[in-house]
Amino acid sequence: MAGSRRAPLVVAGAVGILLVAVVRSYTGGGDDDRTNATGGNGKDGCTTLHVTASSEKAALLKQLAKDWDGDVAGGCVQVTVTSKASGGAADALARGWDEAVDGPRPDVWSPAASSWTQLLRQKTTALDKPDLVGDDALPSIATSPLVIAMPKPMATALGWPDKALGWSDVLRLARDPRGWASVGQTYGAFTLGKTNPNFSTSGLHATVGTYVAATGTSSDLTLADLRKPAVQAYARDVERAVVHYGDTTLTFLSNLQQADDRGEGLRYISAVTVEEKSVWDYNQGNPTGDPTTLGQHRKPRTPLVAIYPKEGTLLSDSPYAVLKAPWVDEPVQKAAAAFLSYVRSDDAQKRFTQAAFRRYDGKSGKAISAANGLLPQEPKLVLRPPAPNVLAQVQTLWAEQRKPAKVLLVIDVSGSMGETAGADTKLELAKAAALRALDQFGSRDDVALWEFSTPLSGSTEPYRQLVPFTPIKAGKALLRKEIAGLHPEGGTALYATTRRAFRVMSTGVTADRISAVVLLTDGRNEYAADTDLKTLERELSPEDTALSVRFFPIGYGADADLPTLRVIAQAARGAAYDASDPASIDKVFTAVLSNF
């Protein structure tokens, strides 16, 4: 199955693999995302075609769909495009798509890479369900190789672009306690941004690439390889440099842009695994990759450059899978074929290459240039993905070898959490989501629980520890009990609680664990004893980004102060999550805990 090949870079339709940068949207997308998702006749008698696409290309596909004058057998076609993480879409299709949870049901699925269609096939087989994608090779609509993106001065210090670099260089810097000082630089510890391989293609492919590098060969990765102690040690030591994980590389790229805006582009992170196209997006000042926002932000002072791992890298091939499902009837199938023909046309492919994708046949455009931090002659060694059972085992093994986390859960129990949200209160929905989310923690994670409002009965402080830090295995029963017992009272002491949580966590930060606070709140600061956001922002900003406490606040409900939560998250090098629709809280908790 898998293997490797030397240049040229050609992936015409069959198997490929790469990254997905996931756009975070839990409250619904734009107007296109809310149209009818079921095939058949749409508005004005048109055939409606719903495409679910990985986010790095969803915005461009939306533009192409809008520009396309669809006509099949004399009838019009209305194409809508929804962005969804490849891993999340694969899980949803395997268990049975629920539009209330997963969004519009797709007729066509275009994940970032064919690895996800292989994993979907394995999942449906295990569940004794029909195959939704078939065994045939799927046509590609664009390609982009996985790269290790690094601030240009750091990469230059390692010998870029003349020296071949790769995972062995990452491993050397990760293992050496001197970090960058081991190569005569003053950048501090080596830190790596890498997404969760259960959700993100970049995370999956970076993990696969690490294992392939560990074998010392470019041949097929096998289950026997994954069992070798030396291979596991290599991968585990690379994971030691990770600052946190997550469902999207956009968290890292957005934080890096904000650091660059402050003149700190060399302080946030040493490297992040992304697709080649994302390096171009970042260097244009547009890390989201959305064509509609291009030019709205200046280019970075410190650009990124792409390192193409010398041990070989994997590709995204953006497969176009017309689902073999009862709702995809003949008119929809014809519409899907017509839209594919348009997307692969020279005019549409030019739009892809202008946005720094490579064509479906692997050819690059002018955007892939050294001036943009990209090397058109690379990658010299392209790896094909391993067999589906090996991919699944990579995900399983990562869960055992990933960097463990120390996470403080902080839940708002102010009186407004007792307000109704559908059939339940906001607090009841949040409690149910938090209880389900506990199963996402790894066996080596330590978790604690606080509640907060304004000073609670019997206390002079607005926060209260309910469960101290304890290994999740030993503490899960107590965590469940205390979460289930939460009840609403009081106001919202957001700043004081955030400040205290940071100080408590800061006393126990170690390089071998991800230290983080997950704080859920439905309001804004109402505590007169602490109203100083500016001081809080300065306190949260780390001097040492390798030894810092990261905040992942959740703005819950329509009245949450999301702008302030973004300030907190940016200061603490985390990410803020929008759950303004209380019904989205399950998805949001899943996304938040993907960081660990």
Language-model regions, residue ranges each:
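Extracellular/periplasmic juxtamembrane helices and adjacent flexible linkers that interface
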Residues: 2-30, 45, 321-411, 428
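Periplasmic-binding protein-like
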Residues: 134-148, 232-246, 294-327
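Von Willebrand factor
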Residues: 403-471, 497-498, 516-521, 553-556, ...
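Short beta-strand-loop
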Residues: 420, 446-485, 504-511, 528-534, ...
